């Protein structure tokens, strides 16, 4: 399915934590419903204004009944800083959904004991993933790591099994790495999104225990459709694949 480009309307725009925002918008195109792991590109400035590129942001939550989509994002540069100016009633350009997300139907057909692992803003797409898994009859165990203070955790309580948190500072939860919270051998599959070093470590631990692992990669993107090759990642076989088109979700054994 090709991505759609629409003018979306802001319903809410909340400050969640330091430099973390939650943007809720009305997505009017029913034929282009997003799924877990997919992303949209957002633009709240003119075509002749900097930055040149729209900003790719993963889907935090999609509600088909209300046609609303939520984006949990970190304010890290000029583009996301401009997004923070959006307020209720404003319109902005929204293009998507894009990419190959988590194959939830395929996952549910093969696995019952599922671990969802996230780090930092990499936790953003894991809420929609957890919702879709729970809707399919499996409540996954959720393990998230943060630098200092966790955010958006309460919403997992009703749709997940175990919910555990680690922090780098020890301010909340376990003092250490998120990969220390679980044993891959206890699960049929592990689904991961977060900093590259964390995903690489999670993939290694899963490989050692023989547990399948799927990761959602993050790369700077330009076109969002695989044409410019700006977000290419190299597979273990030496092949180049576009994160925006072939991913962002990959079998960890393919990319790590």
Where are these regions (language model features)?
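Ferredoxin-reductase
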Residues: 1-88
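Local cysteine-cluster metal-coordination motifs and their immediate loop/turn environment
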Residues: 125, 219-248
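Structural signal for conserved beta-strand scaffold positions within catalytic alpha/beta enzyme cores
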Residues: 12, 61, 165-167, 215, ...
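Short microdomains enriched in Cys/His and/or Lys/Arg
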Residues: 246-256
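FNR/FR-type flavoprotein reductase catalytic core
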Residues: 78-220
